From Swiss-Prot:
Source organism, top-level taxon: Eukaryota
GO biological process: RNA processing
SUPFAM superfamilies in the cross-refs: EPT/RTPC-like, RNA 3'-terminal phosphate cyclase, RPTC, insert domain
NCBIfam families reported in the protein's UniProt record: RNA_3prim_cycl (TIGR03399)
InterPro entries, A to Z: RNA3'-term_phos_cycl_insert (IPR013791), RNA3'_phos_cyclase_dom (IPR023797), RNA3'_phos_cyclase_dom_sf (IPR037136), RNA3'_term_phos_cyc (IPR000228), RNA3'_term_phos_cyc_type_1 (IPR017770), RNA3'_term_phos_cycl-like_CS (IPR020719), RNA3'P_cycl/enolpyr_Trfase_a/b (IPR013792), RPTC_insert (IPR036553)
Any Pfam family: RTC_insert
GO molecular function, one term: RNA-3'-phosphate cyclase activity
Protein name per its UniProtKB record: RNA 3'-terminal phosphate cyclase
Residues noted as binding ATP in the record, renumbered to the chain: 104, 131, 294, 297-298, 320
Disulfide bond entries: none
PROSITE patterns hit by this protein: RTC
E.C. number: 6.5.1.4
Active-site residues from the entry: 320 (tele-amp-histidine intermediate)
Originating species: Bos taurus (Bovine)
Length: 366
């Protein structure tokens, strides 16, 4: 699919791996040859890390593309995509690099393949600086499926920092087109639930303490709902290494989902981990939006590809979201507007409507 190479500046805005994920996925979908320069220029260790490299190699394999300059530490790559193919694709970060970020880059592409796909993704399932796999399965999945597709996410093995070792298998069938979404009516919170986990050598008491601290924190602000956070000991044969963490989800009467999550670190007590997740959830409920701060940017590429006008109501628009919009406009020529919400109940809140006229991408194989 030769044509003029599109130049992408990897150092602007968010300046990290997300620019690489959005731009290479759109390149693959639209058949745009790409040069990305200044990769992760804004980070303490610039250039490609193992998880970015495995994501790039996966995209290359998804479409039999050509990839040059892709090695650890590289700050410039060129990518020339060909036709997207379904079937079985494997990516292994060989570290605790996030399998959820591998999903972010590959899922939009295989939706437009000729046949069903199976993505075998290896790395960290519950890793810092990335969505936890529980977030992907419990929040991202039900919301993104509103675009008119479904996928199956099978967690074979959980993996934690620093070794990774997790494995997730994602199965999905292609679609002809994506439908637009409208997520602007938040409704009221009807349920709060979650899981607090320990894996490996960590004692079960840590899970119970995280859950109890989170419940106490939420109760201060939301008194009329039962908060059901289950402490879980991950089975030995389903978790590699040691880890602990928590995810708490609030569900509303209109089917909106919000989350707060946190991972344990050496020397941080369990209560603090639980409270951090609870406070993140409460912050996401205060802004009046219909999606939380971590879902915003993950929906942008789907809004850009969909046929018709999508609208989502958000809290403050994150830098990740602004970055995703910038590249969706530059590469896919989708049209986005971001406006302060004019609803009376949002007047005192930092609430926005992100609207997109999608490009109506059509699967040429179906």
């Amino acid at each position: 699919m030769a044509g003029p190479r599109v130049e992408v500046d990897g150092g602007i805005m968010e300046g990290g791996g997300q620019i690489l994920r959005v731009s290479t996925a759109l390149s693959c979908l639209l058949g745009l040859p790409l040069r990305v320069q200044k990769i992760r220029a804004g980070r303490s260790t610039p250039g490609l890390r193992p998880q970015h490299l495995s994501g790039l190699e996966m995209i290359r394999d998804l479409c039999d593309g050509q990839l040059e300059g892709a090695e650890i530490g590289s700050t410039e790559i060129t990518f020339t995509p060909e036709k997207i193919k379904g079937g079985v694709h494997t990516a292994d970060t060989k570290t605790a690099g996030s399998v959820c970020l591998l999903m972010q880059v590959s899922m939009p592409c295989v939706l437009f393949a000729a046949c069903p796909s199976e993505l075998r993704l290896k790395g960290g399932t519950n890793a810092e600086m990335a969505p936890q796999i529980d977030y992907t399965a419990m929040v991202f999945k039900p919301i993104v499926e509103k675009f008119g597709f479904t996928f199956n996410c099978d967690i074979k093995m959980r993996g934690y920092y620093p070794k990774g070792g997790g494995e997730v298998i994602v199965r999905m069938s292609p679609v002809k087109q994506l439908s637009p979404i409208n997520l602007t009516d938040r409704g009221c919170v009807t349920k709060i639930y979650g899981r607090a986990f320990v894996a490996g050598v960590l004692p079960f008491k840590v899970a119970k303490d995280m859950a109890a601290a989170a419940v106490r924190c939420i109760r201060k602000e939301i008194r009329d709902l039962y908060v059901n956070i289950q402490p879980v000991q991950e089975p030995k044969d389903q978790a590699f290494g040691n880890g602990n963490g928590i995810i708490i989800i609030a569900e509303t009467s209109t089917g909106c989902l919000f989350a707060g999550s946190s991972l344990g670190k050496r020397g941080v007590n369990a209560d603090k981990v639980g409270i951090e997740a609870a406070e993140m959830l409460l912050a996401n409920l205060r802004h009046g939006g219909a999606v939380d701060e971590y879902l915003q940017d993950q929906l942008i590429i789907f809004m850009a590809l969909a046929s018709g006008i999508s609208r989502i109501k958000t809290g403050p628009v994150t830098l990740h979201t602004q970055t995703a919009i910038h590249f969706a406009e530059q590469l896919a020529k989708a049209k986005f507007t971001v406006k302060k919400s004019e609803d009376e109940e949002d007047a005192s809140k930092d609430t926005y409507i992100i609207e997109c006229q999608g490009i109506g991408m059509t699967n040429p194989n179906l």
